[in-house]
Curated annotation (Swiss-Prot), chains A, B:
Domain of life of the source: Eukaryota
CDD domains: TPP_PYR_DXS_TK_like, TPP_TK
Name of protein: Transketolase
Lineage: Eukaryota, Fungi, Dikarya, Ascomycota, Saccharomycotina
NCBIfam families according to UniProt: tktlase_bact (TIGR00232)
Length: 679, 679
């Protein structure tokens, strides 16, 4: 006998029609997928552990809509399941300033991650599942199961075609993340028409190859029992599960099964016949029968609120039983670092030896790794180059492999930069103050552009340990030497882009990156050794930019970053011999500097002083802070690092020559600070 | 009985040792993969159709080293097979300015594509296979088989982990590209150690799921016959083939099978024992026994040169038999467009109606598609949005699907932007003047950053039709609205980044992009309608920037792009009412403008005139041409396009206000053109 009755079917129809009404009201949006996916949504959400009054509850189940364009479905669910989402909000679907934007946005209660760019959501979900497994392995104790939640995902063909989902899914299979259950909306339709124009692979077989459990629900349009049965079976698996759900896009619509229902509102007539078909009044919109509210209230909301209460009590008992761990959990849930953690950060003096900044980064990570259990690090298969693995770290691995366990905090991401970026976003979105970091070469952070952008947009404070940050990497040549990379990332809003010049600046970069709760950071680090600079300090560098070395009445300021700062210091000596007085400014992070007071910024770059920037990367973007720029607006070259620097004249003499020309150029001219702008 | 003898084994050892000697001489590089892959390289290259004296021969077989770090192997092969690569060149491996850089570079004879960034090579190879299939289907006639070449690929675990290779491989399976044969170096090692730390999926099963033929050679280290047998079997398949080749990384070395031989030179002792093991003098380096030269000369080089001769004769006969097609082939091989093709390009006057620039792009493509058979277009599943499919185009599809055929010139890429980018590079690298273009939303070109960068670095003139180019796309919201995107791409050397303002500028963008043989282009196009502007013309717009509307003695210049140019024109009217005289400059492409004479550039942006830039994207990079910038240095918002423009004040009044402040700011100040620089 079915566990589902007419009231369940009414609920499914309600979800469907609420979604259709939103799209019609906006005259914009995607009605097709919600119509096909409502039954699965009903089955999943009805049994989910959630508390709409406390959407941040750490032991909630999570639901990720990887096909984010189907957001009218998600908003309908949020309304029906008691979240802060009114019928009025639904009526303002896709309106400017509404709580129902065109794709789900992370800051809305009940929205677990921002989705829309395809392939990201499923990859975020892998990150959430990793975080849950780590949290559980770290804190659960017999009789104190603090964490046992699931992550559910909806994804469509588009998500499956994107490489980022392939990367993340392959890793999820390796990691045997049994807390991850994904529903693949097998509706055979994409924007270009029938999926067979571009995609006839055997998805189930591919996911089996990744090591996933794969199930199939043949009638996703109607068969609630089959969906429920698959869900129960998935929970029994010791692996992540993909449930292939064969559905009809736009189910019930006159154009059901065609791509015309994918991304455009249904015609008025169509909406009417749909309502009649589902037993609703065709003249009414945004209708929720009281029985449906009652159903979900009883099935899900009340039990969820109760479960949250019991969990709170469990946590209190846990704190009593395991005071140290309990305090740590409470601290992490409050989003605070342990008191005095910064004392672990190293500082340097000019007497200390020259060290590659990737190595300096390793020292920071080594020093704080034990103090900050929320650090969950890794590398995209460049561990010995990125130096991202803290001494004594345990790998995050399924215990069965014998290579580590789930309490381990070092992830072997494989050569999967984009997947790593999206997974880090998911780890961060899980909560519990998780701070993911991941290593690769700076040039290959670009492979993950799609995920980096979403970190910034959503405010996930993930950290990229981006080593080999210039032509200084040498022989690997132009395919590996970043040129445009920092210009690209500096143009992304809400993103720190650090390029520290020495030990103190590396410490500053991590200090700011870790302290900030809503801004991701890319830390660009050198392969080659860098001297510890006279004039640098953590206190100054956390400002993002500061006067490293000064002179009375400078003839010019040379502003630089990373490996070129030390060369600029040498250039100042060459200039001094010619009686040209140069102020040296180090500007390790534009974003942090931009947050300082105008007064402070002007003290660094005042009117009257010509400014020359020096950075061995594209000059684009530098005129925000400089009048003249010495950079590399061409691709690099393969050769020994110092030889390549020499070739492009990034030497004390090469800088001094350009500085001289800069001084000459501005002689007798009025020099306005680039910080003084018209509006 | 084996077809291979001692001389073959000597040749394999020679390849191995030449690679090891290169890495040792450079004291930098990757000896491991060449040692494992030399036997397969020997078997493949020995039977390849190639002419080292004419590396551009269109009917050559192609070899792509997707694991580009193994380039010492490729350079050894190029030397042994008679290409312009001397022993002296090998001795300068990884030296600045040498012909043997740290990763293979496209411009070197015999190097088919630039590789190194993992996952790209195999995806490029898919593009080459597409181009070959198209070329053959278009021009082959009974008894005139102009094109029947294969593309061979080496790839490693790293390439297989990258999402871009998943995208391209899935599409290759769908397209049934039987001319593509890939050898997967199953050596179980990556930089992080044993592959099982991150990658235990069943690769063979995955490729079967994609629709590939999958074969396995169990002993890739020694078993030349098994390799050869697999190769022959692959040629019989009607699908692309993946040959899993189990090898030992660093075969023969004391550390064979460990990751220590992956990316660092072998120790001197190790090299010596290796030479002894292979029967070479341990005290000598860069040794090639004459028998090995003789072997390859006889097996491959002489037959290849002869085959090229016969092919030349075949083409001559073809021209006689099929004069029109023959002339077309000759024209394409010469890399020239048909005389007068530009006459098909549309022009507009201000009386023509306002049209979205994506639609204007469609008109251009429609107009030239039949004239230019080298155009091979497509979209990443956004055909109805990108408007990339010319009327009457046939889809490039395996005939068996009934959806098109191989002579079709429209590719359904699926939601695979990165794969599309890499495939386009491969299509271009195939030769025959192929001009691939691909559509997606501008924001999602970023997913393909890794491939875009390689287009620019290698000089593949691919075209991105990048629609929905700003917040003007409206309701889809900030996940789809580009902000940093143009700043990113403008910072890449050798890349045109067009953002045309009207019909004439769209024509200019295509004209320049198509005419240029070594520079890729991104053409950013609006979703919303744009007016045909007074003052625009194709002749002016091809310069990349020009004065659209002028006044006598301007108080300021407003420079803008795309959809904002029309608004700036309206702003000028608002300003005129306040007696502020504004010159309006349209700057559709920084790259083309930068190639004009300094004199011309200064005529647009002279000293003495303050310049305000207006573009509804990140301001970063604009100070190259402007003193003040009005842009959007934050993420966008979901809402109707016009409402979002209003919100951010990109209106005539919003621009006029900032223009007024700009004029005010510079009153009494000396204004130097940003084009006048110190060096």
């Amino acid at each position: 006998m079915s566990q589902y009755t007419d009231i369940d079917r009414l609920a499914v129809s309600t979800i469907r029609l609420l979604a259709v009404d939103q799209v019609s009201a906006a005259n914009s949006g995607h009605p097709g997928a919600p119509l096909g996916l409502a039954p699965a949504a009903h089955v999943i959400w009805k049994q989910m552990r959630l508390n709409p009054k406390n959407p941040e509850w750490i032991n909630r189940d999570r639901f990720v809509l990887s096909n984010g364009h189907a957001c009218a479905l998600l908003y309908s669910l949020l309304h029906l399941f008691g979240y802060d989402m009114s019928i009025e909000d639904l009526k303002h679907f896709r309106h400017l300033g509404s709580k129902t934007p065109g794709h789900p946005e992370f800051e809305l209660p009940g929205v677990e991650v921002t989705t829309g760019p395809l392939g990201q959501g499923i990859s975020n979900a892998v990150g959430m599942a990793i975080a849950q497994a780590n949290f559980a392995a770290t804190y659960n104790k017999p009789d104190y199961e603090l964490s046992d939640s699931y992550t559910y995902v909806f994804l469509g063909d588009g998500c499956l075609q994107e490489g980022v989902s392939s990367e993340a899914s392959s890793l999820a299979g390796h990691l045997r993340l049994k807390n991850l259950i994904a529903f693949y909306d097998d509706n055979q339709i994409t924007i270009d028409g029938n999926i067979n124009v571009s995609f006839d692979e055997d998805v189930s077989k591919r996911y089996e190859a990744y090591g996933w459990e794969v199930l199939h629900v043949e009638n996703g349009n109607d068969d609630l029992d089959a969906i429920s049965k698959a869900l129960e079976q998935a929970k029994l698996s010791d692996r992540p599960t993909l449930i292939k759900l064969t559905t009809t896009i736009g189910f019930g619509s006159l154009n059901a099964g065609s791509h015309s229902v994918h991304g455009a509102p249904l015609k008025a007539d169509d909406v009417k016949q749909l309502k009649v078909k589902f037993g609703f009044n065709p003249e009414e919109s945004f209708v929720v029968p009281q029985e449906v509210y009652d159903l979900y209230n009883k099935s899900t909301i009340e039990p969820g609120i109760e479960a949250n209460k019991q969990w709170d009590a469990l946590l209190d008992a846990y704190v009593g039983q395991f005071p140290e761990l309990g305090a740590e959990v409470k601290r992490r849930l409050a989003g605070e670092f342990p008191e005095g953690w910064e004392s672990k950060l190293p500082t340097y003096t000019p007497e200390d030896s020259a060290v590659a900044s990737r190595k300096l980064s390793e020292i920071v990570l080594d020093n704080v790794f034990d103090t900050l259990p929320e650090l969950l690090g890794g590398s995209a298969d460049l561990t010995p180059s990125n130096l991202t693995r803290s001494k004594g770290a345990v790998d995050f691995q399924p215990p069965i492999t014998g290579l580590g366990d789930y309490s381990g905090r070092y992830i072997r991401y494989g050569v999967r930069e984009h997947g790593m970026g999206a997974i880090m976003n998911g780890i961060s979105a899980f909560g519990a103050n998780y701070r993911p970091y991941g290593g690769t070469f700076l040039n290959f952070v670009s492979y993950a552009s799609g995920a980096v952008r979403l970190s910034a947009l959503s405010g996930h404070p993930v950290i990229w340990v981006a080593t080999h940050d210039s032509i200084g990497l040498g022989e690997d040549g132009p395919t590996h030497q970043p040129i445009e990379t920092l210009a690209h990332f500096r143009a992304i809003p809400n993103l720190q882009v650090w390029r520290p010049a020495d030990g103190n600046e590396v410490t500053a970069a991590y200090k700011v990156a870790l302290t900030n709760k809503h801004t991701p950071a890319i830390i660009a680090l050198s392969r080659q050794n860098l001297p510890q600079l006279q004039g640098s300090s953590v206190e100054k560098a956390v400002k993002g930019g500061y006067i490293l070395q000064d002179v009375d009445q400078p003839d010019l300021a040379i502003v630089s970053t990373g490996s070129e700062v030390g060369i600029a210091v040498e250039a100042a000596k060459v200039l001094a011999e010619k009686n040209i007085k140069a102020r040296i400014v180090s500007l390790p992070d534009f974003h942090s500097f931009g947050q300082q007071s105008k007064e402070y910024q002007l003290s660094v770059f005042p009117d009257g002083v010509p400014i020359l920037s020096v950075e061995v990367l594209a000059t684009s973007g530098w005129s925000k802070y400089a009048h003249q720029s010495f950079g590399l607006d061409r691709f690099g070259a393969s050769g020994k690092g110092p030889a390549v620097y020499e070739k492009f004249e990034f030497t004390p003499q090469g800088i001094a020559t350009r500085a001289e020309k800069t001084v000459e150029f501005y002689k007798g001219k009025q020099v306005i600070s680039p910080l003084n702008t018209a509006f």
